Amino acid sequence: MSATLRLTEQLISRPSVTPLDEGCIDLLSARLGALGFVCERMDSGPDSFRVVNLWAKREGFNPLAQENRGQSATKSAANEGEAHTTPIKTLVFAGHTDVVPTGPLEQWHSHPFTPSHRNGVLYGRGAADMKTSIAAMVVAVEEFLAAHPQPGLSIAFLLTSDEEGPATDGTVVVCKQLKARGEVLDYCIVGEPTSVSHLGDMIKNGRRGTMSGKLTIKGVQGHIAYPHLARNPVHLFAPALAQLVATEWDQGNAFFPATSWQVSNMHGGTGASNVIPGELVVDFNFRFCTESTPENLQQRLQAILDQHELDYDLKWTVGGLPFLTTPGELVNAVRGAIHAETGLDTELSTTGGTSDGRFIAKVCPQVIEFGPLNATIHKINECVDVSSLDPLKNIYKGVLERLAGISGMAGASGLAAVADSTSSP
């Protein structure tokens, strides 16, 4: 059994449904601590929803700074300035140990928290999202440091048990603490399952923003046989709804599809068949690209409501802003490592839902997401091909080597022209 598979199984066997961690981070901290990582717990949240957070970092080796320690005071001061012109960069791997609920246990072919193998496939909750990614990166770092004990690259892990839930006490809390103390991050890989048909066929180099609204249209309740004595909020809202559905909010761009507006829930009435409702509650969501801002979308939507002279209350929640990492050092390193391992020229994409990348992008200039196939995430019988585990580990290790300047940069540079011209809406 490979080290990647063994660690993946150890993580799957822990029933870490949000916000529970069930010892995953203790297990990972022990592995990372043995490699020289300084592990900090940054747990957050009330006792009823306590979230386990880990920030673990191993500083890279700066040969210029090391040389300065043996120089005279005068020469050391001069060389120190030189060393500071080539700072050690930091690669962060971000992931979550929590998983979504299992759903009906009787529908699983094997227990979701008992790693099971059938026909070369590993089954278990979290197999794809995202315990395999975490295990692969930990083993990749172990192998990388065994071969290169003093790399010119700092490596960090940001792990949380609150990504699948409200995500209010997880990555966002750690990022705020890192920013407050001046921690500098250069690159981040979020281990989300991004592959579609084959490992490495797609990476996410950005995500759309998300903003939700709760709209209450006010009417006057009354008897359904006397509509002239009431004001039906459903009827009042209907013309505005049609206009909102037909509105083109923007046209997207080379990296993002156009902003979309969708109603998720609509409720009005008492349940009785002879009562005109007094109010209508509408839940809706924007998934927006970098061509729009929350403020602009709010203003435009409210202008439509006002145009129809509606009496309403509206509450907004901005869940995350869009982010985009254009082709550069990190994208090229990931593309080069994928190509070296699989022969694939990966596709850049910004499709899909939100992730913790939206928080990290505020403190790190280059953020991408890459992990195993996502076909079974959150489903009954979630699984991952065993044959993909070590290739995933090898790709992560290849990224480390490229960013540390150890190998593969010629291949990555060769892909740069492709990366610069490739985009996916």
UniProtKB/Swiss-Prot annotation:
Gene3D superfamilies cross-referenced by the UniProt entry: Zn peptidases (3.40.630.10)
Keywords: Amino-acid biosynthesis, Cobalt, Diaminopimelate biosynthesis, Hydrolase, Lysine biosynthesis, Metal-binding, Zinc
Chain sites annotated for binding Zn(2+) 2: D129, E164, H378
Pfam families: M20_dimer (PF07687), Peptidase_M20 (PF01546)
Cofactor field: Zn(2+); Co(2+)
Family annotation (CDD domains): M20_DapE_proteobac
Domain of life: Bacteria
rRNA processing listed as a keyword: no
Coiled coil: none
Pathway(s) it belongs to: Amino-acid biosynthesis; L-lysine biosynthesis via DAP pathway; LL-2,6-diaminopimelate from (S)-tetrahydrodipicolinate (succinylase route): step 3/3
Catalytic center residues: D98, E163
Keyword Transferase applies: no
Molecular functions (GO terms): acetylornithine deacetylase activity; cobalt ion binding; succinyl-diaminopimelate desuccinylase activity; zinc ion binding
GO annotation (BP), single: lysine biosynthetic process via diaminopimelate
Free-text comment on the cofactor: Binds 2 Zn(2+) or Co(2+) ions per subunit.
Catalytic activity, as annotated: N-succinyl-(2S,6S)-2,6-diaminopimelate + H2O = (2S,6S)-2,6-diaminopimelate + succinate
Binding site for Zn(2+) 1: H96, D129, E192
InterPro entries registered for this protein in UniProt: Bact_exopeptidase_dim_dom, DapE_proteobac, Peptidase_M20, Peptidase_M20_dimer, Peptidase_M20A
Family assignment from sequence similarity: Belongs to the peptidase M20A family. DapE subfamily.
NCBIfam families (UniProt xref): dapE_proteo, PRK13009.1
Record text on subunit structure and interactions: Homodimer.
Known role: Catalyzes the hydrolysis of N-succinyl-L,L-diaminopimelic acid (SDAP), forming succinate and LL-2,6-diaminopimelate (DAP), an intermediate involved in the bacterial biosynthesis of lysine and meso-diaminopimelic acid, an essential component of bacterial cell walls.
HAMAP family, per database record: DapE
Protein name listed in UniProt: Succinyl-diaminopimelate desuccinylase
